[in-house]
């Protein structure tokens, strides 16, 4: 996976820099998201990994995308097709999002809970994490029915386990020493 990230990085950086310069971060994010979804389609994967000429591949891809891409987005796709890199569009989209989050100083935080959190709970967690991290956060919530109570918070490589399962595991480890 790191190889994909390495190959995708310059494309994502070029798209991000251009979008930032043009003041079109939202538009480019949408275009890349759509292109990434197209590139993940099984039938499209057959075309982009086939032995067709890159010009043919890019034209097929652009026909599928239709009016979802502006002229610059189309040129971006043509360059990627010419370099036989359309298959990495999902990773380019992920890297673009990471660059945007870094630029906007937004930290992605995942909150795992046993049940769906209320809006007030999400806001309270977001405020606490913003205070702890010193930057804005974007919460993504997940539900794990194996948790009895509590939450697990993940960001970067850090996991804060406030679940009852985690507390029981820590207690078991402490007692076994």
From Swiss-Prot:
Entry GO CC: plasma membrane; proton-transporting ATP synthase complex
Gene3D superfamilies with a match to the protein in the record: N-terminal domain of the delta subunit of the F1F0-ATP synthase
HAMAP family attached to this UniProt entry: ATP_synth_delta_bact
Reported function: F(1)F(0) ATP synthase produces ATP from ADP in the presence of a proton or sodium gradient. F-type ATPases consist of two structural domains, F(1) containing the extramembraneous catalytic core and F(0) containing the membrane proton channel, linked together by a central stalk and a peripheral stalk. During catalysis, ATP synthesis in the catalytic domain of F(1) is coupled via a rotary mechanism of the central stalk subunits to proton translocation. This protein is part of the stalk that links CF(0) to CF(1). It either transmits conformational changes from CF(0) to CF(1) or is implicated in proton conduction.
Topology of this chain in the membrane: Peripheral membrane protein
Entry GO MF terms: proton-transporting ATP synthase activity, rotational mechanism
InterPro entries (alphabetical): ATP_synth_OSCP/delta_N_sf, ATPase_OSCP/dsu
Family, per entry: Belongs to the ATPase delta chain family.
PANTHER family tied to this protein: ATP SYNTHASE DELTA CHAIN
Keywords, ordered alphabetically: ATP synthesis, Cell inner membrane, Cell membrane, CF(1), Hydrogen ion transport, Ion transport, Membrane, Transport
Superkingdom field: Bacteria
Chief subcellular location: membrane
Protein name: ATP synthase subunit delta
Annotated compartments: Cell inner membrane
Quaternary structure and interacting proteins, as annotated: F-type ATPases have 2 components, F(1) - the catalytic core - and F(0) - the membrane proton channel. F(1) has five subunits: alpha(3), beta(3), gamma(1), delta(1), epsilon(1). F(0) has three main subunits: a(1), b(2) and c(10-14). The alpha and beta chains form an alternating ring which encloses part of the gamma chain. F(1) is attached to F(0) by a central stalk formed by the gamma and epsilon chains, while a peripheral stalk is formed by the delta and b chains.
């Amino acid at each position: 996976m790191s190889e994909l990230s390495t190959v995708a990085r310059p494309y994502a950086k070029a798209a991000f820099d251009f979008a930032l310069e043009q003041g079109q971060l939202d538009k480019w994010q949408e275009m890349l998201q759509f292109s990434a979804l197209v590139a993940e389609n099984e039938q499209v994967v057959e075309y982009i990994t086939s032995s067709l000429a890159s010009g043919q591949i890019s034209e097929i891809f652009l026909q599928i995308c239709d009016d979802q891409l502006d002229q610059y987005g189309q040129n971006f796709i043509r360059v990627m097709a010419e370099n036989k890199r359309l298959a990495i569009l999902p990773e380019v989209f992920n890297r673009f999002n990471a660059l945007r989050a870094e630029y906007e100083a937004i930290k992605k935080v995942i909150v795992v809970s046993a049940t769906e959190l209320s809006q007030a709970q999400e806001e309270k967690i977001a405020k606490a994490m913003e205070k702890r991290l010193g930057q804005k956060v974007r919460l993504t919530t997940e539900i794990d029915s194996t948790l009895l109570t509590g939450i697990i918070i993940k960001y970067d490589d850090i996991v804060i386990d406030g679940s009852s399962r985690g507390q029981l595991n820590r207690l078991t480890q402490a007692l076994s020493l």
